[in-house]
Amino acid sequence: ISFLALTFFVLAGAIYRFRKRMLHTSLWCLLMLTVGYTTYAVILIRANANTPLNENAPDNIFTLKSYLNREQYESAPLLYGKTYASEPEYVPEGDYYRVKTTKGSAVYRPDKEKGKYKIIRYKEDVCYTQNMLFPRMWNERMAASYKNWTGGSEAAPTQKENLTYFITYQLNYMYWRYFLWNFVGRQNDVQGHGGPEYGNWITGISWLDNVRLGDQKLLPESLRQNKGHNVFYGLPLILGLIGIYWQLVRGKRGKQQFSIVFFLFFMTGLAIVLYLNQTPGQPRERDYAYAGSFYAFAIWIGMGAAGLCDTLRKKKNSVLPISVSMLLCLLIPVQMVL
């Protein structure tokens, strides 16, 4: 706490002392980042209070690292690694064979008598055969579920099936579906697992929704009147796309601004999809994990409204068109609230 307080005051003093624009902005960003990281102090404080529910007991820096890395769960490969059909690699050892492993990171525990941390063991990472580039279908317990999304057999996955799963499930179902919930419309708040009746995105345009999901009027009354049912007719999405276009056509400065917003959009959305490497049958909807990218797209929605007004302002006799465009832009958030 003393270190964080000192860091805060040093950064605040530096911001006051140095008035250069770039340095000033950089220091403010660093200060806000530091303030954000202070929220993790709550985890340490709570763990040291020894509460009845204290998963992983993150009461020191090493157990906190394990807690934040979610090491209680099986780690998913990212760029290269096993598939669900991979087998452990064996090496001879005397008269027997043992599983081949590599030395992993050290596991530390506090030594209260000596007042320091000591290494109690090293983690062992199992080596597998039949590895694959960019492995998306990696969990052996989910072989049947993977095949439900790719339409293949339960044999070793091909790279085509691997990419099919990545696009259809991880990208489309576990990201773009959530994205479209927020900017096009949502069928209901019942968790979906790929079927046509639960948790899909909809537009509110009957013929289009019926082509994708079947006749929505045939759904039970409980689903048609579900409180999570919202239709925006794709208006926020259209306005956001207009905002992207408006930024890109505004020359070098506009492209620079677009790159900043896009970086925020990508790193808080699609990059998380790549990192999590999720398996089918998640216990709950995961839309909350991508909230940052939805905020970023909301910036483009605001840009779209500004772009429409700016375009119409340059035209002669533009009072009426500007008034109409402003009214339409205001109707979009009103529709989202209703």
Model-derived regions, located:
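Hydrophobic, aromatic-rich transmembrane alpha-helices
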Residues: 5-16, 233-253, 307
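Membrane-interface catalytic loops of GT-C/OST-like multi-pass glycosylation enzymes that act
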Residues: 1, 46-50, 226-229, 254-257, ...
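Membrane-interfacial loop-to-transmembrane alpha-helix junctions, especially the N-terminal start
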Residues: 22-29, 251-265, 318-325
